[in-house]
Design a protein with these regions (language model features):
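C-terminal lobe/tail of nucleotide-utilizing enzymes
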Residues: 70-137
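Alpha-helical transmembrane segments of multi-pass membrane transport proteins
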Residues: 11, 24, 38, 67-70
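Inter-motif core of Ras-like GTPase G domains
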Residues: 15-27, 39-60
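Short amphipathic alpha-helical segments
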Residues: 41-44, 66-68, 94
């Protein structure tokens, strides 16, 4: 595994976004860990984002992270459509939700199938997940 930080990470994100031949996109999903680091700053400065949907797990630490992310997104004046609660790896169905300042768009519940999900071979399932997200937008 390669650990990139600061300018190296920002440069890689910039190169990916500028050198990729994008077709007309309706949606672009950017999967990132929670936070407010260099990747977020680069994406908000370099990409012309029209909206953001955040994803979080229903626990106190994740809610603390997403609140910081919400503040950062607001500083860049990018509209937040809402958030999705990702509970697919948590078998505790009674995990309480904390109230956030943005709309809750939906929730993915625990799935035994997701524990063994193989993105390379289960691409149809990955498409279904994306379609579920888009249906709530």
């Amino acid at each position: 595994a390669v650990a990139w930080r600061g300018p190296m990470l920002s440069s890689a994100v910039r190169q990916l976004s500028n050198s990729t031949k994008w077709s007309n996109l309706d949606f672009l999903f950017i999967d990132m860990p929670p936070g407010t680091g260099d990747t977020y700053l680069t994406i908000f400065k370099e990409l012309n984002l029209s909206n953001v949907i955040l994803v979080t797990t229903p626990n106190k630490l994740s809610y603390a992270d997403i609140k910081k992310t919400i503040n950062l997104v607001n500083k860049f004046n990018v509209p937040i459509m809402g958030y999705i609660e990702n509970n697919i790896f948590n078998q505790d169905k009674d995990t309480p939700s904390e109230k956030l300042s943005i709309n809750k768009l939906g929730k993915f519940n625990f799935s035994e199938k997701m524990l063994n999900f193989d993105l390379d071979n289960d691409i149809e399932d990955a498409n279904l997940i994306s379609k579920k997200i888009i249906a709530h937008v």
